[in-house]
Amino acid sequence: ADGSLTGQRNDVVLAGLNHKCGWRGTTNTLLNFGECGGAVGYLVGKHGEGLRCMFHMMNEARIGVGMGATMLGYAGYEASLAYAKDRPQGRPMGQGGKDATQPQIPIIRHADVKRMLLAQKSYCEGALALELYCARLVDEAHTGAPDDAAQAALLLEMLTPIAKSWPSEWCLEANSLAIQVHGGYGYTRDFPVEQYWRDNRLNMIHE
């Protein structure tokens, strides 16, 4: 195919929609190629250069995916922190055990809830530090002095897969902990934390 117009439709057919766990605000489709005679493909760029160009694009996308995972983790942390400050459960401990004469305390004063909140905070702040460092390396690789730029590019090449994979795994764990802090409410659509988990689950899969 030389790119000239023939008046005929290319044999690419929209076969249906994929019904996803998360990211329901974006459409994801299934395409069939060449089932009725053959689809025509067009070369973009030079022969043998496609994979190199794709990886150049994907390396930038990986940092973006890691940042997206981090922000979803942070959103869950902020939601569960606010909930833990507001949700009363249990009585304060006195010398003889729980003091039934005292008002209930917010669950943020429970040791296990504190643990889950601090774990979320640690995962998300660590992930954010990594993403911002990679963003700085991108700038330095493009604008630094030749030796500094080369060193930044080399370090970025090593860190980019980590900047994608680590936040997408551990900020998803943060989202799971955010659901746990909410208890049964976290499993309902009345609170946003279940959606944060569903949306963040994709970041371990896609790029």
Briefly describe each language-model feature range.
Residues A1-E207:
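Internal glycine-rich alpha/beta core junctions
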